[in-house]
A protein has these predicted regions:
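A C-terminal junction/extension of Radical SAM enzymes
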Residues: 92-162, 203-212
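Generic alpha-helical structural signal
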Residues: 43, 73, 111-118, 179
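Short, conserved loop/turn and helix-capping segments at secondary-structure boundaries
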Residues: 36-39, 104-107, 111, 171-176
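Flexible mid-to-C-terminal extensions adjoining Fe-S/redox cofactors in radical SAM and related proteins
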Residues: 165-271
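Conserved, mostly hydrophobic/aromatic
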Residues: 21, 158, 178
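Structural alpha-beta junctions
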Residues: 54, 84, 121-128, 227-231
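Generic structural signal for helix capping and beta-alpha/helix-loop junctions
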Residues: 28, 66, 96-97, 170
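Radical SAM/AdoMet-radical enzyme domain recognition
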Residues: 1-90
Length: 271
């Protein structure tokens, strides 16, 4: 919503930026989550980015309520027409004390996403956009990449967190170097445990393996860094336990039918 002509011109000048624009569906659904009027602002921003020849895509959080919409031909054709080159799909994470667990997709819905995203980006019969699923594409990067394996997150307060969805840390970038932050106990525990599951359709230490995140946070003494609503790791992981059990059955069946291990992407700690 901050994109204007001046911003686009600056993007052209630096030449090394692309934007992922948050979008949850069409106007009614999107504005219910993002705020009234945001959908129209996003559409206007896309028009400006396209007119300046810039590369951009969408960042879509899929939930039990919007999965069919955000993967529909109508929706995809719309964002392609607007100029999107890629679309990131992010599985809803029940982070925060007031997170609605009923927004977690069912195992049937998540299995649908597994097949639908591969269909969208298929060389035959697909769409003219590259679709990626942060959760269901774990097989292509060897599972969880967080905790400094290939990625970490720094929040607005400077707390160095293992992932944008995992708000626990014991290091702040204002107080230590990046190297020191990457060596904090929680990150080292991540490296000790990765991959968190040999089935890379169950990659996350929170969503699909909640007992592991709880153990790591408790053993390392990491503190909640949630800026809005600090949450105990027991409360967070408790919301994922039933989901993890339900998804395991479907995920194991999918993995048995379609195993995939990227041999060049196994940069785990030697054990």
């Amino acid at each position: 919503t901050l994109v204007d002509d001046a911003f686009c011109e600056e993007m052209q000048r630096v030449g090394n930026l692309s934007l992922s624009i948050s979008l949850e569906g069409f106007e009614e659904v999107n504005d219910l989550r993002r705020g009234v009027g945001v959908y129209d602002k996003v559409m206007a921003a896309m028009d400006k980015l396209k007119s300046h020849g810039l590369i951009f895509g969408t960042s879509i959080c899929y939930t039990s309520k919007n999965i069919e919409t955000v993967t529909s031909d109508e929706f995809l054709d719309m964002i392609i027409e607007k100029g999107c080159r890629f679309t990131w799909y992010f599985h809803y994470m029940p982070v925060g004390n007031d997170a609605a667990v009923d927004l977690l997709p069912t195992k049937e819905q998540r299995e649908y996403m597994y097949h639908r995203v591969r269909e969208i980006r298929g060389a035959t019969g697909g769409k003219q956009i590259y679709a990626m699923d942060f959760q269901n594409d774990g097989e292509f990067v060897g599972g969880c990449i967080a905790g400094g394996r290939n990625y970490c997150h720094i929040n607005a307060n400077g707390d160095v967190e293992p992932c944008v969805f995992i708000h626990y840390s014991s290091a702040n970038i204002k107080e230590v170097s990046l190297l020191e932050a990457l060596k904090q106990p929680l990150f080292m525990a991540y490296r000790d445990h990765q991959p968190f599951n040999n089935n890379h359709l169950r990659p996350c230490p929170m969503l699909e393996n909640p007992e592991i995140l709880q153990e790591m946070v408790e053993q390392t003494g990491a503190k909640s860094t949630d800026l809005q609503s600090p949450e105990t790791v027991e409360h967070l992981c408790g919301k994922c336990a039933d989901y993890a059990c339900q998804w395991k059955e479907a995920a194991d069946k999918l993995w048995e039918e379609h195993p995939y291990v990227h041999k060049g992407y196994s940069n785990y700690k030697k054990k």
